[in-house]
């Protein structure tokens, strides 16, 4: 039985040897310069592939870093200004409380005035905790970034482009404008 296996191995090994011999004979037939040239071409191809992979790695790493920065910036924006829409809805309530206070003061309703003042103060304090601050407009120079001009008043009492009267308060949310102040602006008399 051992002889039989050995003969099978010999018969299967013979075709492999025949197949390998043309390759080895071609390799042996190539001159050393041709082999060096072929190896240099292979090396150049691998170096080019390596450079492409390195460039791709650098680009992907930069993309990842940009993604991280953008995500952090968006997260910070959300934390700082995520309450903006809620606060915009609360501002008309503050305006109405202020109107009620001015009306109650004119009519002399002290009990009602004190209650509304207390509610108004609590609401302003709650808004302040979220970073909402009123814009100071009286006597300030007109700034279209923070003020909305409703009327122009020709006057000598105030320099031109100065806020004369405030119709509705403006508010900032941290450093961003939440709502512009509605104002009248002084102009030079004609």
UniProtKB/Swiss-Prot annotation:
InterPro entries reported for this sequence = GrpE, GrpE_coiled_coil, GrpE_head
Q: Name one GO cellular component term.
A: cytosol
Q: Where in the cell is it found?
A: Cytoplasm
Task: Please give the residue ranges the record annotates as the region Disordered.
Answer: 1-42
What task does this protein carry out?
Participates actively in the response to hyperosmotic and heat shock by preventing the aggregation of stress-denatured proteins, in association with DnaK and GrpE. It is the nucleotide exchange factor for DnaK and may function as a thermosensor. Unfolded proteins bind initially to DnaJ; upon interaction with the DnaJ-bound protein, DnaK hydrolyzes its bound ATP, resulting in the formation of a stable complex. GrpE releases ADP from DnaK; ATP binding to DnaK triggers the release of the substrate protein, thus completing the reaction cycle.
Q: Basic and acidic residues composition bias: which ranges?
A: 1-10, 32-42
Q: In the record, what terms sit under GO molecular function?
A: adenyl-nucleotide exchange factor activity; protein homodimerization activity; protein-folding chaperone binding; unfolded protein binding
Q: What is its main location?
A: cytoplasm
> Biased composition, Low complexity: where in the chain?
12-30
Q: What is this protein called?
A: Protein GrpE
Q: Please verify whether the record's keywords include Cytoplasm.
A: yes
Q: What family does the Swiss-Prot or TrEMBL record give for this protein?
A: Belongs to the GrpE family.
Q: How does it assemble?
A: Homodimer.
- Whose protein is this, by species? Pelobacter propionicus (strain DSM 2379 / NBRC 103807 / OttBd1)
Question: One biological-process term from Gene Ontology?
Answer: protein folding
List the keywords (alphabetical). Chaperone, Cytoplasm, Stress response
